[in-house]
A protein has these predicted regions:
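Nucleotide-activated chemistry modules centered on ATP-dependent adenylation/adenylyltransferase
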Residues: 2-11, 16-404
Length: 404
């Protein structure tokens, strides 16, 4: 009786490491290899077609594209906008949020076809190995995890030589920079990134400033979700994000350098360009200042910071994340209206908002101008009561009062 071949799903990006993995497992191990590309919005149709062609050349018995772009938005990006999530106040968590949903898609596919193993191309030096492995351990228990790049410690040249020797040729030239292009921004690694004292030159960016002067950008939100760009309505939030990216990228907006702590405990630097995330989050946060109460903003910021941290730390499946999402969703019921931004080369500023839920417009008074909801005596009484705790403290600690 013929032995059944081991069925392996390779998380296939089309890059060097995953190309090597497909060929090695098919040729050297004799496995039945299924190449699966999980697309969260970063691959073009042309790239996906090339991936399919190459997967079969490398020895895969089947190639599939798992399009999880809408799921990525509905289960992650939407909440990151609600929470104005920027890691360390800077980075829109572009790559880490994508990886989780790529891993989820691969795990589901492996379960669907009854795979014996899942393989991915992560090295042992970064965060992605944790995001993939943890997801597979939880959602595909009992399925073997194969990581040739991490386990064999092969050099890029060794992998290229192996592929070439077996008749597969592609442009795997080691560029000065490596890029991860996604719906929610592009990360840039390598080159000057490795030197803490240097920034990135203009040539490192994929998108360049092609516009001069300035223009206004109007972003309209309904219950916290982006619905219109410059009064053009979008039923598909993905297309709305892409429209904002198109407008903002022409001004080179969204460039910055993120420095943070990796899950494995070392610090790392990454450059990025993310026009759409920075403009959408900037507009959304600005609108919330008008439409949410002080304590709504405060507590939402606290839980959103935790949400972003857990997302980055590969804790998306932690049950508390669903609780935080419920809180973020509820917080958006009055976040309605249009935020107006002023765009200029490499930067933007906030202008104003138009909203039926604008709390600045009220019948009680205008800041620094007039009050209609209280009298002068009311104000004096309020101030006196508010000062009670401090007056009581310093009445008992006169020595501290004298040293102020």
């Amino acid at each position: 009786m013929e032995n059944k071949k081991k069925k392996v799903v390779v998380a296939f990006s089309g890059g060097l490491d995953t190309s090597y993995t497909v060929m090695y497992l098919a040729k050297e191990k004799g496995y039945e290899v299924y190449a699966a590309c999980a697309n969260t919005g970063g691959f073009s149709a042309e790239q996906l077609k090339t991936n399919e062609e190459n997967a079969y050349k490398l020895g895969a018995v089947k190639y599939v594209t798992l399009d999880v772009t809408q799921e990525y938005y509905e289960k992650s990006l939407k909440y990151m906008v609600y929470g104005n999530v920027l890691r360390n106040g800077t980075y829109p968590i572009s790559v880490s949020s994508e990886r989780i949903f790529q891993a989820l898609a691969i795990a589901r596919y492996a379960n669907e076809i009854g795979a014996d193993a899942i393989a991915h191309g992560s090295t042992g030096a970064g965060n992605d190995q944790i995001r993939f492995d943890m997801t597979f351990l939880v959602l595909a228990p009992g399925v073997e995890i194969i990581t040739l790049t991490r386990d064999s410690n092969l050099s890029r040249q060794q992998e290229i030589d192996y592929l070439n020797a077996n008749g597969f040729f592609a442009d795997f030239t080691k560029l000065k920079y490596s890029y991860n292009v996604g719906l929610w921004g592009t990360s840039i690694c390598g080159g000057e990134i490795l030197d803490s004292a240097q920034g990135l030159p203009e040539t490192a960016y994929l998108k360049h400033c092609t516009k001069e002067g300035s223009e206004q950008l109007r972003l309209t939100f309904e219950k916290g979700e982006l619905k219109a760009v410059n009064d053009e309505t979008f039923d598909d939030p993905i297309k709305a994000i892409q429209k904002v990216e198109e407008i903002g990228a022409a001004y080179g907006i969204g460039r910055d350098m993120h420095v943070g702590d990796t899950i494995i405990g070392i610090k790392g630097r990454v450059g990025f360009e993310a026009a759409a995330p920075m403009l959408i989050i900037g507009a959304h946060r600005f609108l919330e200042k008008y439409t949410l109460s002080k304590w709504q903003q405060y507590w939402k910021d606290q839980v959103a910071n935790w949400y972003g941290m857990f997302l980055h730390e590969s804790q998306y499946l932690e049950p508390v994340m669903r609780d935080i999402e419920a809180m973020l969703q509820e917080s958006q019921r009055n976040v309605n209206g249009t935020a107006i931004l002023e765009l200029r080369p490499l930067s933007f500023s906030t202008v104003g908002v138009e909203s039926k839920d604008d709390l600045v417009k009220n019948k009680f008074g205008e800041y620094g101008e007039t009050q209609k909801g209280w009298t002068a005596d009311d104000a004096k009484g309020f101030i006196k009561v508010t000062s009670t705790a401090l007056r009581a403290y310093y009445a008992n600690h006169k020595d501290e009062k004298e040293n102020i």
